[in-house]
From Swiss-Prot:
Active site (catalytic residues): 19
GO molecular function: peptidyl-tRNA hydrolase activity; tRNA binding
Pfam hit, one: Pept_tRNA_hydro
Subcellular location as annotated: Cytoplasm
Name this polypeptide is given: Peptidyl-tRNA hydrolase
Protein's organism: Anaplasma phagocytophilum (strain HZ)
Enzymatic class: hydrolase
SUPFAM superfamilies reported for this sequence: Peptidyl-tRNA hydrolase-like
Amino acid sequence: MLLLVGLGNPGKRYAETRHNVGFMIIDAVARGFFFPEFCSKHDALVSIGNIGTHRVMLMKPLLYMNRSGTSVLSCTSMHKIAPEHITVFHDDVELQPGTIRVKLGGGSGGHNGLRSIDSAIGKAYWRVRFGVGRAELCNLSDYVLSDFENIAQVTDLVNSVAANLQMLLDGNAAGFVSKVTSV
């Protein structure tokens, strides 16, 4: 089984913020591949379904960003999911808006959600970085917890990530990035 984790914060207040783009992607995947309704497990919302030939668990941790690793560890321990079968979708302020990068392993880049997951399961999992840019005159925390200016454009990119996800799961990361960013 593969585990796809979207990072974000629970609650309507954060629903369309930059920091919640991981949740947005997981929701788009669930809709696009007709996953069953999410249920509460592992201090997260989870749903299990199929993407092509892959059995997949979708996860949205509910412990807030800086404790996401607790949910991921609980799930991976129970279901015996190896780190290389985990893909985490998250915002990245170091990438320009509309930019997507895929990487196996690496550091947290100052992202508290990744830092939490790194300390819980190590660093050998896949990351899909979703560029949200950085506001020069704004506190970083305030910036990532603020709503996107153009949610329609973000929604198009999020839907493109979901629509092309099977390519990534089949091992074609370069093709996935190329297809998603051509939107």
